[in-house]
């Protein structure tokens, strides 16, 4: 693998990431329990961006785990912890005492990125929103992402330390080889586990690792694709968008993912990434669509929207005593979710990121920031 582009920001990638999260919300509210495939797209993109950063670190020989973790979790944790506290407080007011233990266990697991493990070991299947659903169920994907974002830089760091005397390009090749093997092994494991116990596979990091691996492999091979004709890769981008948008309508992801059918949204995400980072998206109008102001607005608030919508939906159904939500109720939950996502993005996420950027300028500041984040997560879990 060659030198990966260090382009600081991609409107196409940012847009499709926001589109993926918005799809998840839309299908939860209006899709009658169907899985959109948006989470799978989000996992691919997360791995692509993280792997690109790790490739550059391996080539330069410089990687601070403290700074990397501080940067990553200063973005993820503050809005997540706010949502968790809100969910617990409101849950204690409206849920029966018989559900309090599950509420606390879900909050603890979600605070430390272990909700997927909790759901899997508890034998809880993925279910559509209902008055008995866990208000923390949606944290399973954030937990899997958090686990990956801890393990992947650690792997790159170990490669850097173990092979410090060889060239940066050789270190990248070692990283690539490990990624290739891990992705293939995870895909085979997912196929096997889906056939044996699909609900466990749905939440498993190891069964989902191949989706992260697809994004990671895309980051490795991207330099080789720069010479492709722009119109060709632009067309691939539109094909990718089609795969992403159609996934939830054509595939029953709740019972088939993360098996072979998950290739549908995963490959869609990879095609969009190829189109975006080879410049083909510009020539065919895809960049214009994905940087359209409404999509950009949703992308900037997509993470917060994802965090807020599920507990609001579950609590709405609990208060109403309903097993499913109508269109008017869904619209009301969506409106409330958009308002809370705007407020939390403006007054929690943005200040946290700005403060973290200042702290990350020095090793001491990075260490203090990471310590604060860990203490906050453990503190919320302990409550």
In which residue ranges do the predicted regions lie?
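Membrane-interface helix/loop caps of multi-pass membrane proteins
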Residues: 1-360, 367
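Internal/C-terminal transmembrane anchor helices
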Residues: 361-383
């Amino acid at each position: 693998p060659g030198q990966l582009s260090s382009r600081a920001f991609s409107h196409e990638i940012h847009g499709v990431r926001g589109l993926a999260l918005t799809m998840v919300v839309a299908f939860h509210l209006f899709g009658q329990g169907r899985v959109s495939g948006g989470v799978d797209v989000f996992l691919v993109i997360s791995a692509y961006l993280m792997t690109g950063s790790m490739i550059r670190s391996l080539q330069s020989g410089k990687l601070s785990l403290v700074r990397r973790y501080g940067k990553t979790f200063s973005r993820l944790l503050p809005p997540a912890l706010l949502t968790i506290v809100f969910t617990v407080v409101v849950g204690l007011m409206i849920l029966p005492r018989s559900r309090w233990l599950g509420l606390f266990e879900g909050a603890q697991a979600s605070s430390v990125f272990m909700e997927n493990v909790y759901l899997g070991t508890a034998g809880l299947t993925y279910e559509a929103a209902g008055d008995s659903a866990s208000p923390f169920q949606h944290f399973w994907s954030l937990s899997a992402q958090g686990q990956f974002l801890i393990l992947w830089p650690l792997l790159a760091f170990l490669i850097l330390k173990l092979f410090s005397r060889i060239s940066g390009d050789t270190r990248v090749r070692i990283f690539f080889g490990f990624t290739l093997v891990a992705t293939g092994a995870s895909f085979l494991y997912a196929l096997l586990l889906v056939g044996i116990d699909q609900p466990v596979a749905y939440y498993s990091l190891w069964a989902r690792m191949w989706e992260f691996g697809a994004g990671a492999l895309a980051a490795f091979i991207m330099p080789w694709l720069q010479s492709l004709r722009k119109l060709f890769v632009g067309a691939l981008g539109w094909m990718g968008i089609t795969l992403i948008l159609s996934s939830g309508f054509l595939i029953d992801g709740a019972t088939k993912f993360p098996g072979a059918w998950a290739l549908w949204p995963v490959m869609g995400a990879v095609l969009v990434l190829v189109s975006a980072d080879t410049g083909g998206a510009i020539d065919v109008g895809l960049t214009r669509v994905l940087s359209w102001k409404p999509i950009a607005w949703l992308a900037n608030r997509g993470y917060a929207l994802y965090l807020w919508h599920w507990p609001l939906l579950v609590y709405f159904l609990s208060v109403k005593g309903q097993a499913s939500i109508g269109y008017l109720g869904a619209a009301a939950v969506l409106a409330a979710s958009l308002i809370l996502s705007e407020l939390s993005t403006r007054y929690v996420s943005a200040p946290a990121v700005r403060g973290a950027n200042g702290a990350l300028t020095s090793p001491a500041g990075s260490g203090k920031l990471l310590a604060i984040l860990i203490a906050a997560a453990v503190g919320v879990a302990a409550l």
